[in-house]
């Protein structure tokens, strides 16, 4: 309430949600590619409206079919059965702009290492579920399971994934190891 006793209206932030758009283009493209691949159930390179509806239902975000068609239909090219990855990126960008405003373009070189570091830390925290500063095989397995990835079924496979980036051989991934791994990822088509 303000001084006159009137309840203040909540203000909506126009900044992008850090969970919706990452500042680091490579991380954002990688995340979008993973989401695209999960939504594309049959692996044909297109997300149909049925696949989109199923994915949203699985996430607990059931969408009205007519509303989904109205929102997504304009991004499906003529003659295509569904969204290709580029179309999916355009839809994601348009939704982000509509919900949070357009991304402010920065001068080349101005986007500092602070932004990249912040994105890396945010991504690390997704995996470090207990907040102890390390990603254990159990934590990685839990995240892979939430993403519906088949690697989550076998703990030995998950432990091998950990070993591939665990430079100090302590059986878990610290932030430095995570950062090196993420910086070594090449995103094709990004």
From Swiss-Prot:
Residues 27-62, 115-150, 153-188 form the EF-hand domain. Ca(2+) 2 binds at residues 128, 130, 132, 139. Keywords: Calcium, Metal-binding, Repeat. Ca(2+) 1 binds at residues 40, 42, 44, 46, 51. InterPro entries: EF-hand-dom_pair (IPR011992), EF_Hand_1_Ca_BS (IPR018247), EF_hand_dom (IPR002048), EF_hand_pair_protein_CML-like (IPR039647). Pfam families: EF-hand_6 (PF13405), EF-hand_7 (PF13499). Ca(2+) 3 binds at residues 166, 168, 170, 172, 177. It comes from the Eukaryota. One of its GO terms (molecular function) is calcium ion binding. Potential calcium sensor. This is Probable calcium-binding protein CML27.
